[in-house]
A protein has these predicted regions:
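Short, conserved, GDST-rich strand-edge loop motifs in beta-rich repeat architectures
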Residues: 2-26
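Blade-loop segments of beta-propeller domains
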Residues: 44-112
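Short loop/turn segments immediately following the C-termini of beta-strands
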Residues: 9-11, 73-75, 120, 130, ...
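Short loop/turn segments immediately following beta-strands, especially the blade-tip
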Residues: 34-41, 81-89, 127-138, 189-196, ...
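A short beta-strand motif characteristic of beta-propeller blades
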Residues: 44-51, 91-97, 140, 151-157, ...
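Beta-rich, blade/repeat-based domains predominating
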Residues: 15, 52-64, 99-111, 146-172, ...
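Blade-level signature of beta-propeller repeat domains, shared across WD40, Kelch, NHL, RCC1
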Residues: 324-328, 341-359
């Protein structure tokens, strides 16, 4: 059995943003837990794994220790450190100010020495130095936050400077790749450098494309970026996983169709890329060739509204999709041809936003 930890939104989200009249999300108490049979695809809920965590939007596991990190989407932003016990049970060890507003993403370097946190509110990028038990020794700014806080609607990104939506460490541990929806850019900084390091690269995107998430091809020569604002999958030339320039753009939905891409995830075999499409209520399925070039193959209905979380299971047999506005998680079986086909019934989970596989 595989423990699936689900980052969700909590009620305090609506202290910072105007809640639309049409919103149907249910607030969680923190991090939810599911149990997945990765052989059959059977999924069952197992309640709250950790409460009192403020809108843990994205989760990251330590590479060598049973420790989970959660980016707390609040003002000020925080990073929560949780011990992972038997059966996926979580015990919160600490919640530390992450030196920015609205912590939106967290990632841990391959050596397990540093957790990096990106902030949506003010564009701050911070480094949390870890001890031998995975605890946070000190938090240091990498790039201080300079932008004005967000107000009003959640998607009002423009006009006030950097707003980071994701940070990824390159697989070799050498670079920090950040997706900046506020400046329509993807910037790579050297990992382990001091404050305000000179970027290794900066790739500009079309205005209001809102580059949201980054994924790496295993060859190290290609990276993928999904634009939330223009529903486009960008294919980038990369050098040792560092994105350097756009080489192709693939519209994910037909012209005239509204979609807000969310998360993208490359299958472990490197041959299929999955992208969640909010408002279109579908998952885009793209074929990937040996060189990393992609081709849009089609769409599979997400069996719910506004798929925000998309993640392939550790075995590569199943795709989990979190439908935010339906408050459900759906399992899809991934066939030999790479196409996801729905299994079973949707499982109720309040406002699912991200997945982490704890075992």
């Amino acid at each position: 059995m595989t423990d699936v930890l689900v980052g969700c939104f909590t009620a305090d989200l609506w202290c910072y943003f105007t809640r639309p009249d049409t919103d149907t999300t249910i607030s969680s108490r923190g991090i939810e837990r599911l149990v997945l049979d990765d052989d059959t695809g059977a999924l069952r809920p197992d309640g709250v794994a950790a409460d009192g965590v403020s809108s843990p939007q994205y989760l990251a596991l330590h590479p060598g220790l049973p420790v989970l990190y959660a980016a707390e989407f609040a003002r000020p932003g925080r990073i929560a450190v949780l011990d992972v016990g038997p059966g996926g049970r979580l015990t919160r060890r600490a919640s530390v100010d992450s030196l920015g507003g609205m912590a939106v993403a967290v990632t841990v370097d391959p050596a397990g020495d540093v957790a990096y946190v990106a902030h949506l509110d003010d564009g701050a990028l911070t480094a949390c130095l870890l001890d031998e038990r995975g605890g946070i020794r000190v938090v240091r700014p990498v790039v201080p936050g300079m932008a004005q806080p967000m107000t009003g609607e959640r998607f009002a990104y423009r006009g006030s400077g950097s707003k980071l939506h994701q940070v990824r460490v390159t697989p070799d541990g050498g670079g920090l790749v950040v997706a900046d929806v506020g400046t329509d850019s993807v910037v790579t900084y050297p990992a382990g450098a001091g404050p305000n390091p000179a970027p290794l690269s900066c790739v500009g995107f079309p205005e209001a494309s809102f580059p949201r998430h980054v994924e790496f091809h295993p060859s190290g020569r290609t990276a993928y970026v999904v634009g939330e604002g223009d529903a486009t999958l960008y294919e980038l030339e990369a050098r040792q996983h560092v994105p350097v320039r756009i080489v192709a753009a693939h519209r994910l939905v037909p012209d005239g169709t509204t979609a807000l891409p969310s998360e993208l995830h490359l299958h472990p075999d490197g041959r299929t890329l999955f992208v969640g499409l909010r408002r279109a209520d579908a998952v885009a399925v793209l074929d990937v060739d040996g060189e990393g070039a992609v081709r849009l193959r089609g769409h599979e209905p997400s069996r719910g509204r506004n798929p925000r979380a998309v993640r392939v299971s550790p075995s590569g047999r199943h795709l989990l999709v979190g439908n935010w506005d339906s408050n459900t998680v759906v399992v899809f079986e991934i066939g030999e041809d790479g196409w996801p086909r729905p299994l079973g019934e949707p499982v109720e989970v309040p406002s699912p936003s991200s997945f982490a596989f704890a075992s």
